Amino acid sequence: ENTATVVVDERTDNGDGNFNYNFQTSNGIEDTKTGTPGSQGQSNMQGTFRFLLPDGTTAEVRYVADEFGYRPESPLLPVGPELPPHVHELLRIAEEQRAQGITFE
């Protein structure tokens, strides 16, 4: 469809960093998200967006965006290999050192 119309446009913003957003168009595009204030001064968001693929099926991506970055989830997205066990141990040690105030330059 070359011309889409907005069929739903709902927005709630409490003015304190909390918000809700819901948007839908006549050609199958949907976007919903919820936002809350983050611990680092950022906005934390979680939501879902959907759109129609050329074969008529719906693509869906769920996501979280916060102080740890943007983390989308969808069966359409490629997934990398699992980290080896020793990397998980190194990350745990680094987190302990960070909590103790140890830094490396």
From Swiss-Prot:
Tissue: Arthrodial membrane.
Molecular function per GO: structural constituent of chitin-based larval cuticle
Region named Disordered: 25-46
Keyword terms, alphabetized: Cuticle
Chitin-binding type R&R domain sequence ranges: 16-81
Domain of life: Eukaryota
Pfam families attached to this UniProt entry: Chitin_bind_4
Gene Ontology CC, one term: chitin-based extracellular matrix
Listed InterPro entries: CHIT_BIND_RR_consensus (IPR031311), Cuticle_Struct_Prot (IPR050468), Insect_cuticle (IPR000618)
Bilayer-crossing regions: none
The protein's name in its UniProt record: Cuticle protein AM1159
Organism: Cancer pagurus (Rock crab)
